[in-house]
Structure formats: C-alpha cells, structure tokens
Amino acid sequence: VSALAALTGGPEKAGVEPIRRGERSLSAVTFALTARTSGFPLTHHSVFFSDDYASEFDALTRRRSMPAVPTTYVCAQDRDDLGHLPAGVDRERMLFILNAPADGDTRTFSTKETGECLTQALTHLSACGLTVDQAGMEFSPTTPDRFHRLFPGTGGALYGRATHGWTASFRRPGARTRIPGLYLAGGSAHPGPGVPMATLSGMLAAESLAEDHASTRPSRRTVISGGMSTA
C-alpha cells in the first residue's frame, strides 16, 4: 500500500503516507525458472538459510548490498509437500526469493549483478546438497528496481513498513482510506505480513466495507386487509 501516494496523486488524497527509506521492509531479487534438480527431493516450500545471519543482515541493512551467501527461499511449484513430481515432468518450475535492500528507487541492478545473484544462490543450494542443473535452465528475474517501477514510491519494499518494535503493526495503515470505495488489505496493511496476518487484514477490510455500506433491507411489498401497502 506504500505505492498509493504515488498512484493516486499524493498522500493527501489517499491518506496513506509513503514510507521513508529507513523504515521500509526488505525487497527481493526473485527468479522464476525451470531446471532439473538432483541431490534430494524438494518439498513445495523450502528455505536454505545462510550460516551467517549476522553478516547477511549487515549487508542488507547497513551496507545496502546483496549478501555473499544469501538465504534462499525455493518454491518447487510442481511438487507436493511429500516431494513428489507429477509423472512426465522433466524440468520443474521453481521460484527463488533472495532478500535485498529496498533501494529500487536509487539503484538499478545490471544484468551482470542479477546473474551474480543467481550464481550465489545456486552455489549456496549446492553447498546444502541440492544441485540445480544449469544446462537448459531458463529463468526470468525481478529486481528491487523492477518492483519499484511496479509499485512507485516503495523502493521495491515488498512488505510495507519494517516490523521493528512491538508498535510496528499499529503504524501500518488500516482498512479505510480517504478514497470512497477503496479499502486496504494485505501484508503491508494492518496488522502485518504473513498469511495469517493478511487473512486478518482481509477480514478487517470486509468488516469495514460492510459497516460503511450497511442498510436495512426493505420488507417484501404486501397487502393486508383493511390497511395499506408496506415497504
């Protein structure tokens, strides 16, 4: 929702302020790809953590750079939770997500830098025992500057305001805006990111809409003896 100010003509119109750079959540470098894998069967969702979290987040938050060994989320889109692939699938579809600074409004990733990010991710996966065969691999990247172009004013931040401190969720915008008929829901609105929180956000938006548009349903017209039609 941080893009609303840029998309609607300013924060005064929507009532949602853009988030300052230091208060943004993380962005990401993502790769939608198809490739063969070996080593062990992936489940539908897998996270390959860096063995040096302190160094990773020092790079992301202080040095504003990509970490050398990135924690890599892999969604194996063709697999079920038991790691089974449908019969006949050779190269499986995957989505890689690597954390990145939300600096898409001030920095553009070159083709070389994007390729280095993929190489670092593949090297990390290999060290964890998963080999992604690069022969015949096809991929499509999305970088923070691309996310910023899709959602102006965000720097590419994917989760709205950073969740620092116990009051962070209360600083996120609520469901209502100043624009009639526009309600906010999702991970960047109150109460915050993650499927359970986003579900609550959707429920709050639905409740707000119902309250704002509540009306008494008229009774069905009828005629009673000795009286008059009622509505």
Q: Which residue stretches match the model-derived regions?
A:
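Short glycine/proline-enriched loop/turn "hinge" motifs that connect secondary-structure elements
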Residues: L82-R91, P173-R178
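A conserved FAD-binding loop/helix module that cradles the flavin
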Residues: G187-H213
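Active-site-proximal substrate-binding core of FAD-dependent oxidoreductases
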Residues: A210-A231
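Glycine-rich phosphate/pyrophosphate-binding beta-alpha loops
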Residues: A28-T30, R79-L82, T167, G187-M197
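A glycine-rich dinucleotide-binding beta-alpha-beta segment and adjacent secondary-structure elements
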Residues: V69-Y73, T131-P191
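Flavin-binding catalytic cores
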Residues: S38-G39, P67, G88, F109-R149
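Mid-domain catalytic core of redox enzymes
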Residues: V1-A87, G226
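Conserved FAD/dinucleotide-binding core of flavoprotein oxidoreductases
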Residues: S2, A6, T34-R36, G88-H124
